[in-house]
Design a protein with these regions (language model features):
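Membrane-water interface of transmembrane alpha-helices
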Residues: 72-88, 166-173
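Transmembrane helix-loop-helix hairpins at the membrane interface
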Residues: 145-264
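Membrane-interface segments at the starts/ends of alpha-helical transmembrane spans
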Residues: 48-64, 142-152
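Alpha-helical transmembrane segments of polytopic membrane proteins
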Residues: 57-70, 220-227
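Alpha-helical transmembrane segments of multi-pass membrane proteins
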Residues: 26-46, 73-81, 118-126
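Juxtamembrane helix-loop-helix connectors linking adjacent transmembrane helices
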Residues: 86-158, 173-185
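Alpha-helical transmembrane segments and their helix-start/interface "positive-inside/aromatic belt" motifs
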Residues: 9-27, 61-66, 97-112, 245
Length: 264
């Protein structure tokens, strides 16, 4: 079932969609700076490499993320409106929908599903270890708990805005635009093309980091795509069936398990 959408106005009365864009853009940009303490703890040379004081780095990170996410969120919401994908909970609040009620049960299930995914991924990672080239990577750096908690917001919010709200929506919209009868909703294969396509792109985006640890053998590539793609498929399904908020919560819960409980 496609998520319920409400009209997105583009003229003078466009304040609700502007509020939606502003809400998600601000949340994503704040998450982009929240990950900085974790990133610096993981790679202390980062500060030396960027060559700027921390306050300036925070401002630059926020400004860059804000501009990028504003464009991506606006595009994702606009395209998603045509195909039944979007952010129904935030949209209902923006429109002050009188009959709105928070779907606590499905949100809780999304959080549980994300936590289960976060617990399964390290187990799946162990299956790849016998096939990985060279020595195993060194033990992870001990990072303060609060830094790991903050880092989880980046995955839950910023990555979902990029991968689900924008990228998955764009892929589905392209398939729908060129392969569907006018006025017909997207078919299942179009939705799944978006889910899998966005997950693959997300996994491919992690290959440069993997290449810093191992040579890019078939096993390394498979591990990178599988571990990063499986979560994306689950989050994409939630985005399709329940809306962006459910995907955000599930991704956040998965990262809490991986980073906070798992300590990675």
């Amino acid at each position: 079932m496609m998520t319920e959408t409400m009209p997105i106005h583009t003229g003078a009365g466009a304040s609700p969609v502007r509020r939606l864009v502003m809400f998600w853009t601000t949340a994503g940009a704040l998450a982009a700076i929240a990950v900085l303490p974790y990133a610096i703890a993981l790679n202390p040379a980062l500060l030396e490499r960027v060559g700027m004081p921390i306050p300036l780095l925070v401002f630059a990170q926020f400004a860059k993320a804000f501009v990028q996410l504003a464009l991506l969120s606006w595009a994702g919401l606009r395209l998603g409106h045509a195909i039944g994908l979007g952010s129904p909970l935030a949209q209902a609040l923006a429109y002050r929908k009188p009959a709105f009620s928070l779907p606590g049960t499905t949100l809780a299930l999304a959080a549980v599903a994300g936590a289960v995914m976060g617990a399964l991924l390290p187990m799946l990672d162990r299956l790849f270890l016998p096939f990985m080239p060279g020595a195993a990577p060194s033990a992870p750096t001990a990072i303060d708990l609060w830094k790991r908690v903050l880092a989880s917001f980046y995955g839950g919010i910023t990555e979902e805005l990029i991968c689900r709200l924008f990228l998955m929506t764009l892929i589905v919209w392209i398939c729908w635009k060129f392969a569907s009868h006018k006025g017909a909703p997207p078919r299942a294969w179009m939705i799944w093309s978006g889910i899998v396509g966005a997950s693959l792109v997300f996994g491919i985006g992690h290959l440069p980091a993997a290449s810093g640890v191992w040579p890019l053998t078939a096993a390394v590539i498979a591990r990178t795509l599988v571990l990063n793609g499986l979560g994306g498929i689950a989050f994409g399904w939630l985005y399709w069936r329940r809306g962006l908020e459910h995907a955000v919560l599930a991704h956040f819960a998965a990262d809490i398990v991986v980073h906070v409980i798992g300590g990675s």
